[in-house]
From Swiss-Prot:
Protein species of origin: Photorhabdus laumondii subsp. laumondii (strain DSM 15139 / CIP 105565 / TT01) (Photorhabdus luminescens subsp. laumondii)
InterPro entries for the chain: KdpA
Transmembrane feature ranges: 7-27, 67-87, 137-157, 180-200, 258-278, 288-308, 332-352, 361-381, 384-404, 421-441, 488-508, 535-555
Pfam family of the protein (one): KdpA
Subunit details: The system is composed of three essential subunits: KdpA, KdpB and KdpC.
Protein name according to UniProt: Potassium-transporting ATPase potassium-binding subunit
Function of the molecule: Part of the high-affinity ATP-driven potassium transport (or Kdp) system, which catalyzes the hydrolysis of ATP coupled with the electrogenic transport of potassium into the cytoplasm. This subunit binds the periplasmic potassium ions and delivers the ions to the membrane domain of KdpB through an intramembrane tunnel.
HAMAP family: KdpA (MF_00275)
Domain of life: Bacteria
GO molecular function: P-type potassium transmembrane transporter activity; potassium ion binding
Amino acid sequence: MAASAFLLITSFLLILMLLAKPLGNIIANLIDGDIPRWLTKIESGLWRCCGLQKPGGTVKEMNWWQYALAITIFNLTGLLLLFTLLVTQHALPLNPEHFPGLKWDLALNTAISFITNTDWQAYSGENTLSYFSQMTGLTVQNFLSAATGIAVAFALIRTFSRHGVNTAGNAWVDITRITLYLLLPLSMVIALVFVSQGVIQNFEPYQLAHTIEGQPQLIPMGPVASQEAIKLLGTNGGGFFGANSSHPFENPTAISNFIQILSIFLIPCALCFAFGQVVGDNRQGHTLLWAMSIIFVIATVGVMYAELKGNLHFSLLGANSNINMEGKENRFGILATSIYAVVTTAASCGAVNAMHDSFTALGGMIPMWLIQIGEVVFGGVGSGLYGMLLFVLLTVFIAGLMIGRAPEYLGKKIEVFEMKMVALAILVTPTLALLGTALTISTASGRAGILNPGAHGFSEVLYALSSTANNNGSAFAGLNTNNMFYNLLLAIILFLGRFGMILPVLAIAGSLAVKKRQPASNGTLPTYGPLFISLLILTIMLIGALTFIPALILGPVIEHLQIWLMAR
C-alpha cells in the first residue's frame, strides 16, 4: 500500500508540473499583454467600442481602486442576474422536470456562493435546478468567478515587476482575456475527455427505469460534462448532482478521477511558473511551488494514514475495520479518495468524490485545516497565489525583524501600509469562521440545524463556517443548512470572505506599483532556497496553529480521543 501511495503522489505531481510549465508561459504572456497580432486586431475594435482604448491604440489602465471598483461592480451585476434567474426559473426554458423557482433566501445564498467562486450548495441540483439554471446561471458564473480571481492575481503580479507607476492593468481586459484565451479552450478539451470517460452531456428529460427489485427509479440527465470541466478547472466545486464527483455521471472512472484532481491544481500551479517568469526570476515561482508541494505531500500522507488505519466506530461494534471505506466509492478506494480530499481543500475547489463527514476524526481534520490556513497550498485559481504571496510578505517582515533589516521583497520595500493590509487579509477569514461558529452554536436557530451531537456536531459547524469563509464550498454534511438562518449567515460570510481579501490585496498591489525597485545588497534576505522555503512553511503553520488549534481541539481532536478511549 505504501508503494501505491508513493506512486500515486509522485506521478500526480510529475504530470502536474509537466502540464503546468508550458501553461505558465501562456499565462505570463497574458499578464504582459503579449497577444498574437491577429487577436490584437480583433481586440482593438472591441476595446474601442467599450471605451477601453486610448487614442494611440493602447489599453487604458486602472489604478488599484478603479480595478477594485470594476471587479466589485462586475460581480454585483452577476449576483443580481443570477438571483433573478434562480427565483424565476419556473418561467424559463429547458426545465423538463418543471422545477419551481427557488425561495429568495436559498437563491441569494446560491447566487453569492457562485459569484464568489465558493459553490456552497444547500440543495441537490438534480431535484432543484433546471438545465437552464445550471447552464446559463451556474456554469457562466463558474467561468466569471474564476476569471475574477485570476485577474486579481494578474494585478498583484504586475506590480512586482513594475515600478514608479500607479496602475495595475485593466480589469475588463483581464477578465475578457482570461475567459476567452485560458478558461474556455481548456474547459472544452477537458469536457471532451470527460465525455469519452462516460460523463453525460444531454438535454433529455429524466429517465424512468426499473430496478432489479422491480421498483421504479427516476434517473437524472443533463448537460453535466460542460459544467464539470469548469467546475474543476476554475476551482469552483459545485456539482451538477448533490453527490458531486462521487456520482458516476460526474466522475465515472479512475481516469476521470485523476484528470479531475489534475484540473483542480493545473492553473494554480501554472500561475506560480508565470509569476517567476513575469518578475524576471524563476526561482521565486519555484520557491512557492516547493513550499506548496511539501505541505501538500505531508497532508496527503496524513489523510491516507488516518483512513488506512480503519474506523474505530466499527471496531467497537465487532466489525472488521482494517480500512475506513465508509462514505467512499469502491471504484476509487482509499488512496485516490484521500488525495482528492486534500487537493479539493488545499485548493478552494470543494468538489468531493467521497463524504468528508465519514472520514475518521483525524482524517477529516486535515482537509479542514487546509481550508482554515487560507487554501494557499496551490489554492484557488488566482486566490491561491495571492494568498501565498501574503504569507511571503509576512515571512519577509518577520525575517527582517529577526535580522534587523528593513524587509523587502523583489526589490520593493515592505512598509507599514503593506503590513496592515497583509494582516487584514490574513485575519478576515479566520475571524469570519470563528465568529460565525460561535454565533451558530450559541443561538437556538443555529443549534437546530446540528443533526449530530457532541464533538462531531461541533466539527460539522466549524467545517461549514471555515469552508464558506475561505470560499471552498465543501461540507461535512450532517448539518441542515437550507433554512433562513444558515442561508443568510453563510451568504454574508461568503461575500465578506471573498471581497474582504480581494480589496486588501489590490491595495497592496497599488502601493507596490508606485515603489522603486531597490538593488539587492549583501544584506538582502534571499527569498528562494531551502532556508526561505522552511521559513515560509513555518509561518503558514504558525498562523494556522495559533488561530484554529483551540477550535480544532474542541472538535476533531476530542472526537478522536473519545473514540480511542472507548476502544481501549
